[in-house]
Design a protein with these regions (language model features):
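S-adenosylmethionine-dependent methyltransferases
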Residues: 1-373
Length: 373
C-alpha cells in the first residue's frame, strides 16, 4: 500500500478512536508503517491535536491509546539514528501522564462526548458525523440503558446510511421512540434530508442530554426533543424545542425505534402500537431490527400522514404465557396475533473488520423486519 493510501486509511482509525472502541478493535498500522514520520504526523493531527480533533476522548482513553501507539512505533524502529518518535506525540504523552486521573467509578459515571462517523463508500466522501453525550457505566446506577448507544442503534444507522434506508426518511416527518442518546434521530435529521425529526424518550435526564447534543450537532428547527412515557399520551414539545415547527405540522410519516426491548416479553410493544391511532386508516409499513438473542429490538414504521401526537396513547393488553416462555414464537407469531404482517428483509451490517463507520459487533445478528398492517 502506498504512503498516501496508508495515511487515508488512518481516517478509519481516527473514526474508531472518536467512537472510543476497545483498543483491541482499533485498526492500527503495523510497526513498519507506523514508524514513518508522515504517518506519525497524521496520527497526531487526526487524533491528538486539540486544535483540530474535537471532541477528544477522555484522558484515560487517550492515554491508553497513545501508549499503545508509541509501543507500536518503538517496535518499528530499526535505525535509531533515522527512526524516531514524533515530537508532538511525545509532548502529548508527557502532558497526558501528568494529568490527574479520575477513579474507575468516576470514569464509569461521567458523561463524555462520543463522535460517530457514518460508513463511507468513496475515498472522496466527506465524513458524516454525529456527536452524542454518553456514559457506558451509568446504566448500572441510573436504572436506564439510554446513556449509551447500543449495537442495534448502530445497525439501524448503518442501514439508514444506505440509499435504500435513507429513502425511508428523506422528505418525511419522523419520530423516534426510546431515542436514548438521540444518535439515530440526529443522524437522520443532519444528513438524510427529512422534513422534521422528533426524538422522544421517557427519561428527563436523557431529554436534557439530547437537547445539549442538538446544539453540538448544529441542528435547528428540523430536529426536536419530546417526552413520552409509554402508556400516556405523547405530550407536545415546548416551543423552545419545536422552534419554527407549528403544532399543526407536528404529525409524522415515519417512526424509528432502536433497542426498545430487552426480552421476549416486551413484544407487548406490538399490542401497544396496535391499539394507538398510529395504526389507523391506510396500510402502513414497519421494519423491525431484532437481535438473534431477542435481547434487543429496533423498528421503523411508516404511517398515515394525518397521525398526530395527540393520538399516541395506548391500552395495555395481556399476553399469552407462551410469549413469556417460548422464544420460538418471536416476531412473526406475535405480529400475526396483532394483525401485522412481518417480513424479514435481507439486510445485514458489514462484518466488523469490513466496517468503515458506525462500528459495532455483528456476532449477534440483528434481523430486519418489514411489518405491514
Amino acid at each position: 500500500m502506498s504512503l498516501d493510501k496508508e495515511i487515508h486509511s488512518l481516517k478509519k482509525l481516527a473514526a474508531q478512536y472518536s467512537q472510543q472502541l476497545d483498543l483491541t478493535h482499533l485498526a492500527l498500522p503495523n510497526a513498519s508503517t507506523i514508524v514513518h514520520p508522515n504517518i506519525q504526523c497524521a496520527i497526531y493531527e487526526l487524533m491528538f491535536n486539540e486544535a483540530a480533533a474535537w471532541p477528544l476522548p477522555p484522558v484515560g482513553y487517550r492515554t491508553r491509546v497513545l501508549k499503545t501507539i508509541i509501543s507500536r512505533i518503538e517496535e518499528g524502529i530499526t535505525d535509531p539514528e533515522e527512526d524516531e518518535l514524533n515530537s508532538d506525540l511525545i509532548e502529548t504523552w508527557t502532558d497526558l501522564i501528568s494529568l490527574p486521573k479520575p477513579s474507575q467509578i468516576q470514569q464509569a459515571q461521567q458523561l463524555t462526548y462520543i463522535k460517530y462517523t457514518a460508513p463511507t463508500t468513496t475515498t472522496s466522501q466527506d465524513p458524516q458525523t454525529v456527536i452524542t453525550s454518553e456514559s457506558r457505566g451509568l446504566i448500572y446506577s441510573s436504572g436506564t440503558t439510554g446513556f449509551r448507544t447500543w449495537e442495534a442503534s448502530l445497525h439501524l444507522g448503518t442501514y439508514l446510511s444506505t440509499p435504500t434506508g435513507a429513502a425511508h426518511v428523506t422528505g418525511k416527518r419522523v419520530i423516534e421512540l426510546g431515542a436514548g442518546t438521540g444518535f439515530v434521530s440526529m443522524y437522520a435529521a443532519k444528513y438524510l434530508r427529512p422534513q422534521f425529526v422528533l426524538a422522544t424518550d421517557r427519561e428527563g435526564t436523557l431529554i436534557e442530554n439530547m437537547k445539549g447534543s442538538k446544539a453540538r450537532n448544529g441542528l435547528g428547527g428540523e430536529f426536536g426533543v419530546g417526552a413520552w412515557e409509554w402508556g400516556t399520551p405523547l405530550g407536545y414539545p415546548t416551543e423552545d424545542d419545536t422552534e419554527s415547527i407549528t403544532r399543526e405540522d407536528l404529525c409524522f410519516d415515519v417512526v424509528l425505534g432502536a433497542d426498545l426491548v430487552r426480552d421476549v416479553s416486551s413484544f407487548i410493544l406490538f399490542g401497544i402500537l396496535g391499539s394507538t391511532g398510529l395504526m389507523e386508516s391506510r396500510p402502513m409499513t414497519q421494519t423491525y431490527f431484532l437481535c438473534f438473542s431477542l435481547r434487543f429490538m429496533t423498528f421503523l414504521i411508516t404511517t398515515r400522514p394525518k397521525s398526530s401526537f395527540s393520538q399516541l396513547h395506548y391500552g395495555t393488553r395481556r399476553l399469552s404465557r407462551r410469549f413469556w416462555t417460548l422464544v420460538g414464537y418471536g416476531v412473526d407469531y406475535f405480529a400475526d396475533n396483532n394483525r401485522f404482517k412481518a417480513v424479514c428483509l435481507p439486510y445485514e451490517s458489514p462484518q466488523t473488520e469490513n466496517q468503515t463507520g458506525f462500528f459495532h459487533e455483528t456476532e449477534i445478528p440483528i434481523r430486519t423486519y418489514r411489518v405491514t398492517r
